[in-house]
Amino acid sequence: MTVIKQEDFIQSIADAFQFISYYHPVDYIQALYKAWQKEENPAAKDAMTQILVNSRMCAEGHRPICQDTGIATVFLKVGMNVQWDAKMSVADMVNEGVRRAYTHPDNTLRASVLADPAGKRQNTKDNTPAVIHMEIVAGDKVEVTCAAKGGGSENKSKLAMLNPSDSIVDWVLKTIPTMGAGWCPPGILGIGIGGTPEKAMLLAKESLMSHADIHELQEKAASGAELSTTEALRLELFEKVNALGIGAQGLGGLTTVLDVKILDYPTHAASKPVAMIPNCAATRHVEFELDGSGPVHLEPPSLEDWPDITYNPENGKRVNVDTLTKEEVATWKMGDVLLLNGKIYTGRDAAHKRMVDMLNKGEKLPVDFTNKLIYYVGPVDPVRDEVVGPAGPTTATRMDKFTRQMLEHTGLLGMIGKSERGEEACKAIADNKAVYLMAVGGSAYLVAKAIKKAKVVAFEDLGMEAIYEFEVKDMPVTVAVDSSGQSVHAIAPKKWQAKIGIIPVES
């Protein structure tokens, strides 16, 4: 009988979450590099370049791929012949491992988990509790999968209760464009079919734990070998989702998904539950077994697994944000690449809610935003000699409902985030001759290298959601919504969908 010791299990969980914070799965890197090689849209290729370069930097520096180091998810398959030498419950051991990983002094990870989600929403400080799925199976080992998934992609999860005769392909192709770019494509789609609603969602999440291997399936189809129903569906969805032209970061292009994963389960005769969960550019998961011989040893990938490319935005225009005016902003056009220099402020969900509440009460804000830019970010705490930890953008659409009031009552000139802006936000930007700039999701460590000074200037009690002042040098951004309200995310995907020519563009 296998005996799993408490400390071995806890340390294995801790090591796994540290490991995936800075190592992409090699299969993801290989798939992204293939997409990079064939990409024809310069803006999308630039975004993929940043993701690939950032990934290698993180592997070398052992720092997080993304500032959103995710909510910890653990899949366990525990053999029936396993005995535990432990005083803690399995859940408590998992959570202790997560706690150790996220508070590690050499690579502190961001605590993003909030207790009392419908009320006070208070940070638990150590990213616990984890979400745990445990299954008792035959055997004498413990199979463990650890995954860290950020809010940007989790928030785009979808569930539909289709009629038995409804087309899954039609539903997916109708749904993907409604998800925007907040899930940070190019990524992987996980689809669960059948069972009950909660089973379909679990299948979709579990499917994302497998390796990217769509190229093997393409080779199988080309050889004339017979495909299963799910294999044929994977290939059809892979081709047609990419034909939508959404592209990397929603900028338009040839590749939106690097793979499509599907798991299914028998379902009721009256039902066809279908769930879809995307994995973002910060795909993070690792699998291992414990057999009682001690804690797991995870073999680091070789740096040779990363492509030898560098990021140098030669076409970027340097901008002094300390002297920014509406007149200068008006000269920027959708798609322009800028290199920001000077002081910017940060602020995301909680800070915006508090600022708007203060404005509604007639109170003075603690920061003067006149002619300033605000960056939607919740950075990782610094370690060693860092000014700030990884500091990539968060999804901008969550701030849409605050945009008009912030622009009209604070003197704010522009915003920096990831993904698209909604119609109302674009109108507010146009009405106020402001601007929205996009930083690349999945390039948090690369962005952090452009931040030369950082200090909290307001709302320190909000933790990672506090307002910081950053002094930046050559921080790369793209004009996503210009002062006339033109949005690259609204225009570019349709252009590339038409260019690919598989799916007609609706007028």
Predicted feature descriptions by range:
Residues 1-312, 408:
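Non-transmembrane, aqueous-exposed alpha-helical and coiled segments at domain scale
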Residues 162, 204-208, 275-279, 292-294, ...:
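Short, solvent-exposed amphipathic alpha-helical segments in soluble enzyme
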Residues 208, 212-252, 346-475:
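Feature captures the catalytic cores and cofactor-binding loops of soluble hydro-lyases/lyases
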Residues 252-260, 267-268, 281, 449-507:
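C-terminal binding/interaction regions
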Residues 314-324:
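Short, structured beta-strand/loop micro-motifs enriched in basic residues and often containing a Trp
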Residues 327-330, 367:
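Residue "hotspots" at secondary-structure boundaries inside conserved domains
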Residues 329-332, 338:
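Short, well-ordered loop/turn sites that connect or cap secondary structure elements
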Residues 337, 343-347, 483:
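Short, charged beta-turn/beta-strand-edge "cap" motif at the junction between a beta-strand
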